[in-house]
Amino acid sequence: AQWRAEGRTADAELMESLAAQPTAVWFTTAGAAEVRENVRALVSAAKAKGRVPVLVAYFVPYRDCSQWSAGGARSEQEYKEWIDAFAAGIGDEKAVVVVEPDGLALLTSEPWCAIGPDEELVPQRFREINHAVDTLKRGKHTRVYLDAGHSAWQALDDYDAGYGEPRQQLGIVNRLLRGGVTRADGFALNTSNYRFTEDLVRYGTRISKCLYLRTERGAATCPADEELDALPVRKSKMTHFVLDTSRNGRGHYTPGEGETDWCNPPGRGLGERPTADTGVPLVDAFLWIKRPGESDGECQGGPAAGRWWPEQALELAELASPPLR
């Protein structure tokens, strides 16, 4: 309304088109009673409109290795009580839940993690994620996807020799298995990131095929990418996944000195609109998990993580691929 009043009609129309797209709602703060009531209110409102809400549970202890999005529960017990309340808020209504962005891809054992080398924290993280899966899946109509990073992060089932302590560093397939993915509906890729959809589909399909070989065929490790690519897709047998396409229309950013490729990179655009009609056998949906226009953190001139940044929102809308209007 303000932009229309200022004569910025085209900008205002772009923002209205952006705002019309369904986006996930994140739950990030303490208080079991509060999260139960807030989740219940969201789910009830979505049901009244005939929609299925997408929720993000983001409260795991030592969240984000105490970086821009630091926070989360203070203990394993607090987290379990919080996720129990989260699930109670959904009940048996329809909902999609993305569980703990970076919760498996970013373990506290990463060598640069600010938490420190406490080996007990890694098994604790897996217990927390497993508890979330089992608790949420008690809901009759809750679909649960474990966040699994993105296509340029973790290898499939081997650690990078220069990337941390080998006993704690597992590839993403092992992390998903230890996190309980076989009891969930699948995994999520690219949450709050910028990787091209094509790259994510290739990576996610390889993960699914390796999970199939590990769980159904008794394989000890993932075969080479070429062998995985040659393996036929078995839609009913392989793990499905969802993609965050909210900001990947222009792909990832090549950072300059002192920059990152993930924190408010300039020149990015909105990606594919949210849909369950993806045309990809193993991809259940393209979702807007990250709300376009919410800052990644205090970088590139942006406000604190999660704060609304209208200038970035407008740039994302202007550079959308496919175009927003």
Task: Provide a role label for each language-model segment.
Residues 1-89, 291-323:
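N-terminal carbohydrate-binding/catalytic regions of secreted carbohydrate-active enzymes
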Residues 2-14, 154-310:
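Surface-exposed substrate-engagement region within the catalytic domains
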